[in-house]
Amino acid sequence: MRIRFLGHAAFLIVTEKGTRIITDPYQPGAFGGAIGHAPIPETADIVTISHQHMDHNDAKNLPGTVTVFDQPGEYEELGVRLKGVSTYHDDRRGQERGPNVAWVIGADGLQVCHLGDLGMALEAEHVTAVGPIDVLLIPVGGTFTIDAAGATEVVEALKPRLVIPMHYRTPKVKLNIDYVDSFLRDKPNVRRVGGSDIEVTPGTLPKVPYEIWVLEAAL
């Protein structure tokens, strides 16, 4: 499986069979230009959307025809297993920012979880629903999502082998959110990949307890 960090909360996941999945595609220039990433040129077979905010739901502007999943439930498409777990965008059961769907993507013997704009601590029922995770794509910037401390708690609850942070402030994301360094501080096993793409297989995943890989946005 290949994972490419496109920017913000958008990733391209390509399975060994060539199925292409894009998570939370952003609208370039959203929020008065706060989202400064270039338009996404990648084609996709499947798009997962965690919630209906413009920096996460711009499937309509992707090239080609895609199948969009934006509701909780269990699905299978082109040999990829998809599970949408209902969570919230805030810590008040959605009263401030509404619902959020955490997506578990199963392919190539791997379970990849994209948490979207998770804004709450996971309860036992959520951990059970998500299930065992190999790769966790997690927001860490706070303000609109869990912050560095909250993200650390979620990592400890889900126990993935590989953690890839997302949804943090960068020169191309000028939202009022924190930089990734707050999440990385005092953590062991941090690797700055120096690129946008990684290849992962069950045999090449980090062993124990987990590693954090920081990717550079491709766009």
Which residues make up each language-model segment?
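Short secondary-structure boundary segments
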Residues: 25, 51, 140, 166-168
